[in-house]
């Protein structure tokens, strides 16, 4: 690459496409894939690459893609199939027979004799979708599951790629002779194909497919763990890109009206004028905003206490982070997005630089915690409610940051901003503010301005040049030092996890979780199920692993100097002041690959806790291991083997496989009830780890653990993604909930831990978190309008938001009828939305109608006859328009 002329280089630009429909081309996390591609192609053309045509808009780009063959077989015309690139069956069969015997066998068992029957032309050759553009090939990554028997996921998570999958990459390498590929955005499926986790061999499908073809991979810089897999299993040169822009959610529609009325009530209560008369109005507004679904009011309840809860909840919603668009590769933030982006980078402390909101609370001689927990109360000195004070703080901080921005981030701009009325305060406070503003001008802004290096380094990689490495993680979680983006990012040393900081976070989360369970159930949980992923632990210094250990009453020992974990020690019951709680971990395949030592560490901790000579009331781990050991011994199992099997608590994917399987069966619509979801969850995740065991399939042990769970939990440590950002959250955590309901015959308590604010961690139920995200983001005009600015990809993400909500409801029953109704009214049936989606992505609009109709058909909600008919008509009308467009292509 370094020696070749750019004009001679052949580059394949590969868009991820999951599910394999025209509605999801370029399905990359947080990225406007099409606009990024347009800008990349313009830069490449300037640098001498041979490109004949660059679409002017994302609509024109997707029109170009879908006017040629794609993965969406249902939309492919005869003409598109005829004009499509092809690999001859003869060439593919010859290549196939050079593969390792085991790799051949697994593919033929799944897909039949080469070349199979997936994406085959009338003459028996294999289709390679895409369109040629000079020396660029614009294409979609093959699906792994074309025509797969839907029941396959219930029986075997080891799904070999199709013949067409390998043919696609073979054609790129050996027929078209590509010089490099760009996999555009996080993430594709190549690096998740079966095979070894590191040191791939002739039986590992990622290596079979890609070989030594250079792989340039723009990748979401916050998604650390998955990025490591792209490096290890697909040789990716990562180009870390910024998260999607975010802002405070604020209030809107009925919630905004209710908030104003609550403030009015508080003032009238303070003066004694007419507050009592407002009670019916307030209750009506609560119902209008559907907040009575979250916070029901019963006659006889303390009304002021109830309103205080409502006010605090609204303040929490307003303070939530909401995505207000998508990132464009190499595009620095500008205008209001830059102002809001800087405020988000300052909302938590950055090393010695305090949170801007903590600093402003100090200006008013209070604390942020006081303000947020007492929203309905009137501060006598300020003559306003704390909720109004928080609104004032948001306005003042934005005004001051905007002044620095408008002044060009200079020293003079800082001086001018400090003279504003909004920046008035005592000298000591102003000194702190000045230091914070210089942090903005000297650190934040220069780092954000280097966002253009994302594009520069993509081109450097294509030129065979060095791409500077850098750390990864969440910039908005006190991570300004992680910037600039555009670097080939790395992970962490697993031997340092959990760090002392991570341990403190895990302890806080554990205490909050137990406190909430006792409040909900009146007792300690005996059995907890935890979902543990790699990336969140890398970003949080091992908080989930720490919480796992802390539940057991075990803590790490660290080496002096290096702070690597050297051993474990038992926390005495006198110090723990509670029972040792039994905890089962469901680790991801990524955790298994990137943090294998920690699976062993957690298993060692379980055995250590179980070995303590303590009463059943003080040690639930020992209690349950003893009970299960006796059952096994009664069945004839050797005593040592029985104890070992009874103490397994770490379960995950088989080596070479990834995922929880639940999203696969939900996407294929191949399920009837929770029993089906439980079956696939156990089949994919029922492999034990620990004591030298690296994924031995013991489904009955996993079923036993799942059936006994009182509580499930998955923690989040940043708000750059949430439970509706990806179907993985539901597949792992929702799948666990469904499995407990099926196998245990009960609905467990299910929590989401939140350590986004390291100084004030929190815990919510899954249903509470769903409603928080639904209200603060999914229904928020800022979110919807932000995505609408991104055309095709924005519509894709809106449709996926509805689909993931449906999937959560399927596993966990967290969607109420009114929530489906709001999705229908705001997303699918709104005339303005329909007009826009038909223009930019009609396939996504059809998917929305289909999802809502499936929910009604499965009796997950009652759409009502009128709304159901509207949705059916919408589905059919879009289908007809798409068919007409296809006929035109003929």
Model-derived features: where do they sit?
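Ligand/cofactor-recognition surfaces for anionic moieties
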Residues: 1-890
